[in-house]
Amino acid sequence: MMEKGSNLVRERAARAWERHLSWVPTLYLLRGIPYVAILALVPIVLNRMGVSNAVNLFCCSLALIPFILRPLLGRFSRQLTDCHHLILYAEVLMGLIFLAMGIVLRLKVWLPAFLFLFYAEALAAAFHDVGIGRYFMICSERRFYQQVPATRAAATCAAFALALGIPAMVGGNLEVIHRRIPMAWSTVCELLGGVILLLAVYHAVVLVPLGEQLVRKRNDYKALLFEDLRKLTDRRYFRFEMLFLLLFLLPEGFFYRVGILFLVDPGSNGGLSLSPQELAFTQGTVGAFGMLLGCLLGGRCIHLHGFRYWLWPMTLAITLPKVFYVLMAYTLTTSFSLITLSVFLEQFGFGFGIMAFVAYLAHLSRGYHPVMFYSYCFALAAIGITVSGALSGILADYLGYRIYFALLMLLSLASYLAAAFVRTEPIEGLKL
């Protein structure tokens, strides 16, 4: 009976993979929207609503905690429902929460309820992420995160345009039309919720139910956690792998959201005073395009020459372009062309450099139980980004943008330290 069920799952997975181009782009597009909301959109909304940068970035960083708990959520979700329904339930929930966030923004006392819904959105997004990982792994016959990388990268980068570029443009225009900031960003949240619900309906039609078996027995999650950690720590280069995961993106955690707020903050606060419409063009359109080009080029380079060959160039690419923000902070340039070019170069370098992290994460996820190892490795990386993001707003408020970005260049040494100690012998010639 169990063998018959396994054969049925394989048949349905093969049928789903035959038309994967009908669901992979939209699924990864929707997967990227919550990340963009956490990293960029909600910080902008809170900034426009008058919340200080320190409180803003601290609260937004807490939304990454569900992604740190991803391994436990993955274990727990296997007892709730199959990955097909998990994806659909999470998408409907995310859409409804965005609609509720839009309603809450119209209230006089809005911040506590808004943050509660925001954290609920992050939790639903983490479950959605788990469901996508399981569904993709089954359909691609366990070649976990090795298929259609260009399609997934393009869809994820398109999420920046859909969840940052377009909403920021709409929000800025509505601010001008209505002269009411809460009304403008309330409408943005409601429109984004509607888009998510439409994509959920589309996925309900195109995604093939796999009929996977649920885990019916009650698990001892504490015992399972220790067992998973034992398997993780038994790896030959465990310490060096964890060092890389924690440190490589640490400077980016300190930079990204502060960089966005620097662009929109008024000159009296040391910012560049871009309007939401200008931010939508620079960060949400030109920046997203630069990141997409960087990701595609980085993936191609690693495919041709391997991880070790491109590790140091990619480390330089993800750190050195931050110097443009140092220059802009000290000059307070008003040239929109120079600002846009600087954002493009920084995002291109980020897209190119992060492919080293993606490649290493893909390598660590190979072998026995790839979803489990991917979840734990992703959680470790999320810890570094969460801690750095929580501190970034406090430090930026205290030091000012000029000193903060200058110190950030020194903090980039963490990425070089991670690259120096990574053990590349076992993954030489790694292909994406």
Regions inferred by a protein language model and the residue ranges of each:
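Helix-to-loop junctions at the C-terminal end of transmembrane segments
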Residues: 68-82, 293-310, 396-397
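C-terminal ends and interior cores of transmembrane alpha-helices
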Residues: 92-109, 316-334
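A late C-terminal transmembrane helix in Major Facilitator Superfamily
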Residues: 367-398
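Cytoplasmic membrane-interface "Motif A"-like loop-to-helix N-cap segments
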Residues: 79-93, 303-317, 336
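C-terminal membrane-cytosol helix-exit motif in multi-pass small-molecule transporters
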Residues: 194-213, 418-422
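Helix-loop boundary and gating motifs at the non-cytosolic
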Residues: 6-67, 240-244, 248-268
